[in-house]
C-alpha cells in the first residue's frame, strides 16, 4: 500500500500522466513482474509460478523493452540463492537448479501468452509479406545473427508469432542504438 501511495504521488508519474505513452504501462508491468517473481522466490508453488508467468507475459506485451525482465529475473534468482546463508554449496546448487527450472517455466508461460496474442496478428499476414517487411526494415540492423534468426522463424508457420514479437524487440534495439 505504501508503494502505491509513493507511486501515485510521484512527481514523475504526475508530470507524465497527461501524456498517452506506454511508459506508465511499462512501469506497471516492470513493477508487477518484479513483485510476482519475488513472490515466486519466497514461495515457489505452482500457483505462484503460473501468476508470475502470466504477469511476465503481459509485461512483454505491454512494451518490448520489458525484455529487460529476463536478466533481472536471472540476477534476482542468483542473489536469492547466494543469500541463503543456512545452506551449504551442494544445497544451494540443488535449490538453484530447482528454482532455475521453475523460472524457465515462468518464461515458457509468459511466451505462450505472447505467442497466442501475436498468433492472432500474424494469422492473415502473408508469410512472404512478413519476410519482406522484416528484411527491409531490419536491413540497417548492425549484427546479422539476430535478423537471420528472426527471418528463419518467419519461415515456420508455428514460430511466425515469435518472429513478429522478436521483430519488435529488434526494432526497439535498433532505435536505441541510433
Regions found by a protein language model. Give the residues of each.
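Transmembrane-lumen/periplasm boundary regions of multi-pass, lipid-linked membrane glycan transferases
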Residues: 58, 71, 77-94, 98-178
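Multi-pass, polyprenyl lipid-linked donor-dependent membrane glycosyltransferases
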Residues: 1-9, 13-32, 46-50, 62-69
Amino acid at each position: 500500500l505504501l508503494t502505491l501511495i509513493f507511486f501515485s504521488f510521484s512527481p514523475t508519474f504526475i508530470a507524465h500522466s497527461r501524456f498517452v505513452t506506454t511508459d506508465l504501462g511499462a512501469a506497471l508491468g516492470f513493477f508487477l513482474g518484479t513483485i510476482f517473481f519475488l513472490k515466486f522466490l519466497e514461495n515457489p508453488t505452482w500457483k505462484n509460478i503460473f501468476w508470475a508467468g502470466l504477469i511476465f507475459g503481459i509485461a512483454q506485451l505491454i512494451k518490448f523493452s520489458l525484455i529487460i525482465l529476463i536478466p533481472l529475473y536471472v540476477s534476482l534468482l542468483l542473489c536469492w540463492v547466494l543469500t541463503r546463508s543456512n545452506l551449504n554449496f551442494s544445497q544451494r546448487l540443488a535449490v538453484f537448479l530447482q528454482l532455475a527450472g521453475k523460472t524457465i517455466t515462468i518464461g515458457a508461460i509468459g511466451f505462450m501468452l505472447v505467442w497466442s496474442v501475436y498468433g492472432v496478428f500474424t494469422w492473415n499476414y502473408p508469410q512472404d509479406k512478413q519476410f519482406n517487411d522484416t528484411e527491409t526494415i531490419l536491413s540497417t540492423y548492425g549484427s546479422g545473427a539476430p535478423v537471420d534468426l528472426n527471418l528463419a522463424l518467419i519461415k515456420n508457420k508455428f514460430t511466425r508469432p515469435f518472429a513478429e514479437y522478436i521483430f519488435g524487440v529488434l526494432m526497439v534495439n535498433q532505435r536505441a542504438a541510433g
